[in-house]
């Protein structure tokens, strides 16, 4: 697992220094960019993993690249579109891109609205747990018992 993440990070690093890099503004553009960024063997490994494993493994590798280079740079309109769909954080947004990419590679319905609704539900539950813990005078609180997607 860690080897795949490391391979993906190493494969992507040369692209970080490219000047004038075009960032995607749509999911289709993101898919095309990921097709270019990921070597065929990494793309194949991502596709062949289960959806959950692919997203988990990719989160701190290609997901980190997506967050830093596409979203934090402010150059891409895609993060705003994902926020409109329900992403509440850049982690949510990059996970939605990775989930959508995995589904695209595997010819599955992307269901972006459903993905966004899950994140909205997750954050609502997180806020409820925080409020409940504060009301009890507790310093800590749990996280929702489900993950997205």
Give residue ranges: language-model regions.
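Compact alpha-helical subdomains of small soluble proteins
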Residues: 45, 49-146
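Hydrophobic h-region of N-terminal signal peptides that target proteins for export
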Residues: 10-18
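Positively charged n-region of N-terminal signal peptides that target proteins for export
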Residues: 1-4
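Sec-dependent signal peptide cleavage junction
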Residues: 20-24, 28, 138-149
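Small-side-chain structural scaffolding
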Residues: 17-19, 30, 63, 94
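N-terminal secretory signal peptides
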Residues: 19-57
């Amino acid at each position: 697992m860690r080897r795949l993440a490391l391979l993906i990070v190493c494969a992507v690093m040369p692209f970080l220094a490219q000047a004038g890099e075009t960032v995607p503004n749509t999911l289709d553009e993101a898919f095309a960019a990921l097709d270019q960024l990921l070597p065929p063997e990494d793309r194949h490994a991502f596709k062949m993993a289960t959806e959950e494993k692919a997203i988990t493994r990719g989160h701190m590798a290609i997901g980190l690249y997506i967050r830093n280079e596409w979203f934090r740079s402010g150059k891409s309109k895609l993060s705003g579109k994902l926020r409109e769909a329900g992403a509440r954080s850049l982690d949510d947004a990059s996970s939605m891109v990775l989930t959508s990419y995995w589904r695209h590679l595997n010819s599955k319905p992307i269901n972006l609205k459903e993905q966004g609704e899950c994140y909205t539900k997750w954050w609502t539950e997180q806020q409820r747990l925080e409020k409940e813990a504060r009301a009890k005078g507790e310093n800590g609180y749990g996280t929702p018992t489900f993950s997205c997607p």
